From Swiss-Prot:
Protein source organism: Shewanella amazonensis (strain ATCC BAA-1098 / SB2B)
Quaternary structure, from the entry: F-type ATPases have 2 components, CF(1) - the catalytic core - and CF(0) - the membrane proton channel. CF(1) has five subunits: alpha(3), beta(3), gamma(1), delta(1), epsilon(1). CF(0) has three main subunits: a(1), b(2) and c(9-12). The alpha and beta chains form an alternating ring which encloses part of the gamma chain. CF(1) is attached to CF(0) by a central stalk formed by the gamma and epsilon chains, while a peripheral stalk is formed by the delta and b chains.
Protein name as catalogued: ATP synthase subunit alpha
Residues that, per the record, bind ATP: G169, D170, R171, Q172, T173, G174, K175, T176
Record PANTHER family: ATP SYNTHASE SUBUNIT ALPHA, MITOCHONDRIAL
Entry's EC annotation: 7.1.2.2
InterPro entries, A to Z: ATP_synth_asu-like_sf, ATP_synth_asu_C, ATP_synth_asu_C_sf, ATP_synth_F1_a_nt-bd_dom, ATP_synth_F1_asu, ATPase_a/bsu_AS, ATPase_F1/V1/A1_a/bsu_N, ATPase_F1/V1/A1_a/bsu_N_sf
MF terms in GO: ADP binding; ATP binding; proton-transporting ATP synthase activity, rotational mechanism
UniProt GO cellular component terms: plasma membrane; proton-transporting ATP synthase complex
Subcellular locations according to the entry: Cell inner membrane
Length: 513
């Protein structure tokens, strides 16, 4: 066979022209140790802190420890089939999750993947889970309310849009119930919600999702799940993922509410990761940066000004402020709020709602202790009518607790003291509220007005609940226009006061409770 040199050169030229290769410079390393969800990798010289490392089987790990000879990374998912000698690659990017309106009404995992069986999610792109919080210049003061629907909270511990309000208490004191009711109450308020479940039983999360659906609030909510059975890395990252999903709405001039349930379990997951990475332990075996773990998360909840929104949307949205309100939950052990994580989160947040076991067991639900619960910035955001009327409620309850303790030792009480005690008892009874029954501003105003103006005087203690239910039914039926006016404006003036008084006088005359 005769080889023609011209043919060969033409063939080589043709092959060279057709040759198409995509060259991608990627750092490759080898796993040298695997244990408890932590891998140690040798050879990743160019890896960044927090960078995603690609593992076989479409899985990823996150580089957390950058050491001289190796990299300590935490695996996001199952790791049983990983072994020494397995090759891994850097990706050059940090963890991102899908964001957008398509997530509303869906249940997703830490990585934003759907786990509700409703098919793929139509997202508006991806955003990094770790973002620096807006600076001082980008922020605006809190001045609009977030109505939780709870009389005890909205009257005494008001929450504003862009605030961080901690819900703290022992297990089984109604912390999750309060947060879920706050989400249900946003059904028609236009506030988008994100519920982040960290380290909880799958059955508990399923129950929460079912309740949100029953009350028509799931369509307005993103549920992010990192259950107790999932890897510690996913539990540690879930709050950051949820925060990124909530920031999507804040940065576009809308209002969002995020619940972290709960940050104690996130801190435990982070402690586990840190100890496995052989980082030095500190108080209660938590690592030294556990404060930063929560502060960098909670600082992202804020109210941003019009300029920030306009700049972020490149002029598509103008004249609107955005907000992300956070309700972190912390579980205490035997009421010990001076433990490490509770004190950290109390110092980071703008106030706290203390729920107490004794109050819960005595039948006072929500079990809010108004003496040590506080809202540091919410007062400026409180609805005008509630602010005007509720001033005496906290005072009445504080005096009642003081006198109740004193009256145990005093045999005879003067009339003024007895009247104060009776008023305090009735106000305490009035603050009780059933789960999944949030109240509108007008309903709260009517009930507080009745307490403030002495309409509860002479009503038997066990009849206070019946009085309240009958009063609200009467006002909604007979004074619907007034109730609508209060709900729409939140205003309080002499005219509204006169109409409220006339309505209550008329109701008391009926004696229908």
């Amino acid at each position: 066979m005769q080889l023609n040199s011209t043919e060969i050169s033409d063939l080589i030229k043709q092959r060279i022209e057709q040759f198409d290769v995509v060259s991608e410079a990627r750092n490759e390393g080898t796993i040298v140790a695997v244990s408890d969800g932590i891998i140690r990798v040798h050879g990743l010289a160019d890896v960044m802190q927090g960078e995603m490392i690609e593992l076989p089987g479409n899985r990823y790990a996150i580089a957390l420890n950058l050491e001289r000879d190796s990299v300590g990374a935490v695996v996001m998912g199952p790791y049983a089939d990983l072994a020494e000698g397995v090759k891994v690659k850097t990706t050059g990017r940090i963890l991102e999750v899908p964001v957008g309106r398509g997530l509303l009404g869906r249940v997703v995992n830490t990585l934003g993947e759907p786990i509700d069986g409703k098919g793929p999610i139509d997202n508006d792109g991806f955003a990094p889970v770790e973002v620096i919080a807006p600076g001082v210049i980008d922020r605006k003061s809190v001045s609009q309310p977030v109505q939780t629907g709870y009389k005890a909270v909205d009257s005494m511990i008001p929450i504003g849009r862009g605030q961080r309000e901690l819900i703290i208490g022992d297990r089984q004191t109604g912390k999750t119930a309060m947060a879920i009711d706050a989400i249900i109450n946003q059904r028609d308020s236009g506030i988008k919600c994100v519920y982040v479940a960290v380290g909880q039983k799958a059955s508990t999360i399923a129950n929460v999702v079912r309740k949100l659906e029953e009350h028509g609030a799931l369509a307005n909510t993103v549920v992010v799940v990192a259950s107790a059975s999932e890897a510690a890395a996913l539990q540690f990252l879930a709050p950051y993922s949820g925060c990124t999903m909530g920031e999507y709405f804040r940065d576009r001039g809308e209002d969002a509410l995020i619940v972290y349930d709960d940050l104690s379990k996130q801190a435990v997951a982070y402690r586990q990761i840190s100890l496995l990475l052989r980082r030095p332990p500190g108080r209660e075996a938590y690592p030294g940066d556990v404060f930063y773990l929560h502060s960098r998360l909670l600082e992202r909840a804020s109210r941003v000004n019009e300029e920030y929104v306009e700049k972020f949307t490149k002029g598509a949205v103008t004249g609107k402020t955005g907000s992300l309100t956070a309700l972190p939950i912390i579980e205490t052990q035997a009421g010990d709020v001076s433990a490490f994580v509770p004190t950290n989160v109390i110092s980071i947040t703008d106030g706290q709602i203390f729920l107490e076991t004794n109050l819960f067991n005595s039948g006072l639900r929500p079990a809010v202790n108004p003496g040590i619960s506080v809202s540091r910035v919410g007062g400026a955001a409180q609805t005008k009518i509630i602010k005007k009327l509720s001033g005496g409620i906290r005072t009445a309850l504080a005096q009642y607790r003081e006198l109740a303790a004193f009256s145990q030792f005093a045999s005879d009480l003067d009339d003024a003291t007895r009247a104060q005690l009776e008023h305090g008892e009735r106000v305490t009874e009035l603050m009780k509220q059933k789960q999944y029954a949030p109240m509108s501003v007008a309903e709260q105003a009517v009930v507080i007005f009745a307490a403030e103006k002495g309409f509860l005087k002479g009503i038997a203690l066990k009849k206070v609940g019946d009085f309240e239910a009958a009063l609200l039914a009467f006002m909604n039926a007979e004074h619907a226009n007034l109730m609508k006016l209060i709900n729409d404006t939140g205003d309080y003036n002499a005219e509204i006061e006169a109409e409220l008084k006339a309505g209550l006088d008329k109701f008391v005359a009926t004696q229908t409770w």
